[in-house]
């Protein structure tokens, strides 16, 4: 059974979605992560280190911490279906809408991971950046 694209879970007319409305049709595509990757390429969305941002399957990160993986590769693990798809779609929309903010937050997270390592909980710095 194929998962429903995240657009089906959204009320596109909700006022809080107004800034994102131009991007919502991309979430209706069967391979919406690829559609958002193409849009990221078109907009030249980059990490703080200048790497192009792309939305990839979660297994792409392997055992690497999520934010560290993004900072090192520009590849954002994105669940295309299931319970996490809507959350990851929202994250991708933020990368497309607020790319410099997302890049700065990701860089801060990655720096904290490099400093403190991965622990059972995020810690104050990473919680604030999340």
PLM feature spans:
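Aromatic- and glycine-enriched beta-alpha-beta binding-site module
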Residues: 65-130
